[in-house]
Each structure stands twice: as C-alpha cells, then as structure tokens.
From Swiss-Prot:
Role according to the record: May modify the assembly dynamics of microtubules, such that microtubules are slightly longer, but more dynamic.
WD repeats: 142-189, 194-237, 240-279, 287-325, 329-368, 412-451, 495-534, 541-580, 608-647, 653-685
Gene: EMAP
Family annotation (PROSITE patterns): WD_REPEATS_2, WD_REPEATS_REGION
Subcellular location(s) per record: Cytoplasm, Cytoskeleton
Lineage: Eukaryota, Metazoa, Echinodermata, Eleutherozoa, Echinozoa
SMART domains per the UniProt record, alphabetical: WD40
Protein name: 77 kDa echinoderm microtubule-associated protein
Length: 686
C-alpha cells in the first residue's frame, strides 16, 4: 500500500477513494484547514452526479462538483453553443524525455549497471535506464504506481520490478512485472491478487539460469514466495517474518537457498522438495543487531552481512553460524555491501557516510566519504574497473572510485514537491519542496544549475517577467524574492501564518499576487525590476483556501479558485472583488492554470469529487491544456476544454498526485511534478 495522501491540496481533507483504502489525509500536522463541505452533501460521502446545464439566455454553462454548482460564463463571441457536442482529444502526445530523481529515501537494492552501459533504477512509477556517457534515458512505464523493488536476471536483459497497490482497475493490486530491457516489452505479470500492500524485495535464481523468482511482500507476515516466472506459476510460499524484511537474495552458487534479512533476523531458506524450510542465523556470542541491513556474497560462497551496530559478519557457505566478525566496521548502520570484480569488498555507512574498501581477507584498505548534501549511502553498485555507483538516502546517485571525488549524476527533492516555475526567457525551470530546497534545472543538460537551502519548507514559485528575480512561497506564511544569478535574498515578507499555495507576478511585472491557505490573496506593487515591493492590500472574499490564480493579459485583473470550488475575480489595483462575473467573460488571461472556468469546464471526469484535478496549464500557443490529477496521470486536452466530459489522452509516470504542470515558452516541452513521489518529469510534445 502506498503511504500517500488523498491527493487534495495539502492541508485539505477529502473523502477516501474507494479503490485506494487506507491512504492518509494530506493535511499537515497542526493544520485546522479542511475542504468545505458542499451544499446538499450527504453524510455518507457519496459522489454527486448532477448533469451540466447550459443557459443560453444568460450565456453560461453550469457544472457541479460534489453537488455544488460552478457557473462558467461563455465569452460573448461564442454562438450556437452545444452542451453535448463532442470534444475530441488532441492529436499531440506527450513523450517522456527525462525523469529527475532516484528513490533512495526508503528503498534499497535498487541500483544496477547493465551491459549496455546504462544504470537502472526507479523513481515514482517509472523504471529509468540512464546512459551516463551518452546522456540519455530510456523508460519502462508499465507500472501504475510506486515501484518498490527490482531484480536483474542473470542474462542481464530481463528485469523484474515490483510495485505497490495502485490506481489501475485491472492491474491496481500489488504485482511483479517481468520485462525486456532492450525492447521495453512486458513479458509477464505475476501475483495480481496474491501480494499484499507492496512487493518490497525480488531476486532471480542464479545457477539454473534464472528460472525462478523469489519475492517478498509487505503484508503483516511478509510472505516469501517462489515463482516459475515464465509459466507465471507460484511454486511455493510461506510466512517470512512479522518484522520488516529489507532484502531477499538467491545464493549465487545454490538455487535451493534463499536468504532474507531485516529487523532482528537473517533467515536461510531451503527450497528442496517444493517447500520453503527456514533456518535462522545464530549470532551466538555476538550482539544480535536491531536490524540486519545488507548482504553480499564472496567468490567462495560465503555470505557477508552488515547491520545496524556497524558490524560485518561472515557466514560460511552452507552455514547458519558466524565464522568471522569485523566489529565496528562503521560508526552506525552498514546500509550496503558490494563485492567488486577483483574480490575486494565495499561497505557503505549510514551515520558515518563512509565508503570503505576491504581486501578479500577483510582488512581495511581505503576509506572515502559522501557529503552531507547528497546524504548517507543507501546502496552500492559496482561499475567498470574500480569505479562504482552510490545511491543515497537523499535520492541522489553518485559515481566515482576510492581515489577521487564523487560526481553527482542524479539529484532530487527528498520531501513533498509542489513548487514549479519555468524561466520566461531561458531553457531553465525551478522546483521547490517541503525539504526546503530550491533547485534551478537546465532543460537540455538535465542537471541543477544551482541549489539553495531555505529556512522553511517551500510551496510555490514564480518568476518575474525579466527572469532576473524569482519569488518563493513558503509553508510558514513567509515569502521571499531571490536574485536568480546570485541566489541572494532580495526581500523577505510574512503574510499570515499559513502556506502560500500560489505566487505569481503580473505579465507587466508591476504586481505580485500571493495566494494563501488563509483564504486571502495578498497584492504587492513591484518596482525596480522586481527588487522593491510595497503592499497594496489583500483580496478578501474566498471562504476556503486559495488554490489557483491567473493574471489578465493587461495585468489589471485576477481570477482565483478556492478549495470549496469558488471562481472569483478581482481588480488588482484596489483588491476589490468583481462581483458581476459576466463582466469578466471576455477577459484575456495571460495564463490559465486554474481548474474552474469556461475554458476548463470539461476537464472533470465522470464522478469527480472536486479534488481529483490538482493543476492545469495552457500551452503558450493556446492549442493545448494539460492537467495533473490524483491518480498520477497527466491528461492532455484540446484547448479550450469547453464541453463537459471532454476527451483527452492520458500519460502515466507519476505515482503520487501530480501537483504542478507547466509548458515551456514555445509549447514543445512540459514539466510535471509529483507530490509525495518527489519526482520531476520532462516531456516532449510530439
């Protein structure tokens, strides 16, 4: 089961969805904010199905979200509007170009080097094959939710990946997908209806050319199962442990032995006769660790383990007793072990962040260390020659060797991600998250240009039209403006005590609107190219938190959406509400990022509860609208989406709620961010 929020805006609460039981609310601790109850709502939380209405005399279309009416006035030049007209999907598609990030925070044993020169790992619902030398990525997108485990077949081509319970009606239960890493073709799907919550560990057998696959799920008993994967047949299964299981590996010299380890245990399983028979490792005179964290196999078949006490134990081949101990090998846990091609052993520490090279007879040879910024070692993977790769707990991948500094190949946010802004004139975009990190990325190089750590978690971002200044909205009620080139603070302001969901400059750069979770929109006058700010006032009228804002092309008006499905309009200079909505029907909006209004009234699928769609973006050429939903999908519409239940084309990759989408200036690329999946994805419009 994926530990994710119901995918409303943070600090809001909404009914749980029937296909994803047990997902916690996305409200932040301490927040009293909830999405307002709809008028006429039922205590049972049933979805409403009132049909859309068109009033030709008044010139509006009315849709209903959880029973609440949302009135959308048609532009005055729209004639002969047909409510039931078909709205076809666009001919354009999205092609996934790049996935920013790696899931190291809470997964392990998930980084391998393939003979193609690609490193393989996963982020969100995508398995990434990254060729570092050629600087390109390929992607396996067969999963519909978080990938949690991976195994590479002895043929180095066939891959097994396991996922959590997901959204798909047919393949939404936890399962394993077997696929070809050359063609990206799915070969087999295992365990639909068998696994519980998630598949957390996988291993192919070695000696018999990988005929069998072992898997462990995240049920209360952490069931271990063995499969003939080509026949999609389960051969045996047993309850493994009531405590967490962190790894599962076939012995490379004995296909009748599987080793599992985790909290307080290491188990040696014998598969002879089609049954799984367990023998527990005996620690005897040595301290039993709280966690056995990692294992590797030597050339002679011995098993090496690393534990939470920082000790390395050697278990003789075919034995369940410790034959040798290296006590205090690390200060703190040993998160990963890796046997190099020459028989030497790498160990990676958590607390001490050290990578230590040991000789084949377990003498310490060399020591190096990863930085605080990239985080402790999560997993180690041997590369070519003396080189190796390091996956870290801060979602980074490094490359290097014992003799030099590490090169950061992959970087990502480490907590929930909402903030996204595209540079107005350059091929750059900026993301900011609850991890307090603000990162400027390069579209072409796919790497950070700079990274700045803030004092508070970050919620939103927006560039000044000059591109020289960027405003960041915080989760604390503060907002700041940064110099893009130097990253120096230009100004710091506090408005209220709640997060600022949206922050956006007017097209002429003379105003800044800060939309807050306290129901207000704060307006500032901006001068000196974004370097001086004077408060104009605040827009007061919403009865729930503000979720989206857009400026008019002439920088005089604002439109805003709220958590209780209000669509309001404002005069920017006076902060007064424009109460006669018909007066805004012909306003040209510089951007369209809201989820309410005539141009987007068709984005809501049948049975929507009003929180299903989190974000939209109109392309710069005005031909397309992208939306991001609760189910990890990006939906591409023909703009304007002015007919209810419009057709769209959907694209998957994210596993959590899609929190932001944005097109670049020439409408050829789109950037999307995931909430709890912490990922950022770059797409081409084709």
């Amino acid at each position: 089961m994926s530990n994710r929020p119901s995918t409303a805006r943070p600090n809001s609460a909404s009914p749980r969805r029937p296909n994803t039981p047990g997902r916690p609310s996305s409200a932040r601790p301490g927040s009293g904010r909830t999405r307002a109850s709809p008028r006429g709502g039922s205590a049972g939380g049933k979805r409403f199905s009132k049909e859309p209405q068109h009033n030709a005399e008044e010139g509006y279309v009315r849709i209903y979200l959880r029973g609440r009416p949302v009135t959308n006035y048609l532009p005055s030049d729209v004639e002969d509007y047909d409510l039931n007209a078909k709205h076809p999907a666009p001919t354009e598609k999205l092609k996934l170009d790049w996935v920013y990030g790696y899931r190291g925070r809470d997964c392990r044993c998930n980084l391998y080097l393939l003979p193609t020169g690609e490193i393989i790992y996963f982020m969100a619902a995508v398995v990434v094959l990254y060729n570092v030398e050629e600087q390109n990525q390929r992607h396996y997108t067969g999963h519909n939710d978080d990938v949690k485990s991976i195994a590479v077949h002895p043929d180095s081509v066939t891959i097994a990946t396991g996922q959590v319970a997901g959204h798909d009606p047919d393949e939404g239960k936890p399962h394993v997908r077997i696929w070809n890493s050359i063609t990206m073709e799915t070969l087999h799907v295992l365990g639909l209806g068998f696994f519980d919550r998630a598949v957390c560990a996988l291993s192919f057998s070695k000696v018999n050319v990988g005929v069998h696959l072992a898997a462990v799920d995240e049920s209360n008993e952490h069931v271990l199962s063995v499969w003939d994967w080509k026949k999609e047949k389960k051969l045996s299964d047993t309850k493994s442990s009531q405590d967490p299981v962190l790894a599962c590996e076939y012995h490379p010299m004995n296909d009748e032995q599987i080793i599992t380890l985790g909290k307080g245990h290491i188990h040696f399983w014998n598969t002879t006769g089609g049954k799984l028979v367990k023998k527990s490792g005996i620690f005897e005179k040595y301290d039993k660790p709280k966690f056995v964290l990692s294992l590797a196999f030597t050339g002679n078949g011995d098993v090496i383990t690393g534990d939470s006490n920082g000790n390395m134990y050697i278990w003789g081949k075919g034995n369940t007793r410790i034959s040798q101990a290296i006590l205090g090998a690390h200060e703190g846990g040993i998160f990963s072990l890796c046997v190099m091609n020459d028989g030497q052993i790498l160990s990676g520490g958590g607390k001490d962040k050290k990578v230590i090279l040991w000789t084949a007879d377990y003498q310490q040879s060399e020591v190096t260390q990863v930085t605080e910024a990239t985080g402790p070692v999560r997993t180690l993977c041997k590369g070519k020659g003396e080189d190796f790769y390091v996956g870290t707990t801060r979602n980074a991948i490094l490359s290097g060797n014992m003799g030099g500094e590490f090169n950061t190949l992959v970087q990502a946010h480490t907590e929930e991600l909402w903030g996204l802004a595209l540079h107005p004139t350059q091929g750059l975009f900026l993301t900011c998250g609850y991890d307090k990190n603000v990162i400027m990325w390069d579209f072409e190089q796919h790497k950070p240009m700079w990274n700045k750590l803030m004092e508070d978690g970050c919620q939103s971002a927006g560039f000044h039209p000059s591109g020289a200044v960027v405003a960041i909205g915080m989760t604390s009620g503060r907002w700041v403006a940064l110099d893009v080139e130097s990253q120096d603070l230009i100004t710091v302001h506090t408005d209220g005590k709640e997060q600022h969901d949206i922050i956006r400059y007017s097209p002429d750069g003379n105003f800044l609107a800060v939309a807050s979770h306290d129901n207000y929109i704060y307006i500032y006058s901006v001068t000196e190219e974004g370097r001086k700010y004077s408060k104009v006032g605040k827009c007061s009228g919403h009865s729930s938190f503000v979720t989206h804002i857009d400026w008019s092309a002439d920088s005089t008006k604002l439109q805003s959406n709220s958590g209780d499905y209000e669509l309001l309009f404002w005069d920017a200079a006076t902060c007064k509400q424009i109460v006669i909505s018909k007066e805004t029907r012909d306003v040209e909006w510089a951007t369209f990022t809201g989820v309410l209004g005539y141009p987007v009234c068709g984005i809501w699928p049948e049975g929507s509860d009003g929180t299903d769609v989190n974000t939209t973006a109109r392309s710069a050429n005005g031909n397309l609208l992208a939306s991001g939903d609760d189910f990890g999908k990006i939906n591409l519409f023909r703009y304007p989406v002015n007919h209810p239940k419009a057709d769209c084309t959907s694209f998957k990759g994210h596993s959590s709620h899609v929190t932001s989408v944005a097109f670049n200036g020439d409408s050829t690329k789109l950037i999307s961010t995931g909430g709890r999946d912490m990922s950022c994805m770059q797409w081409s419009v084709v």
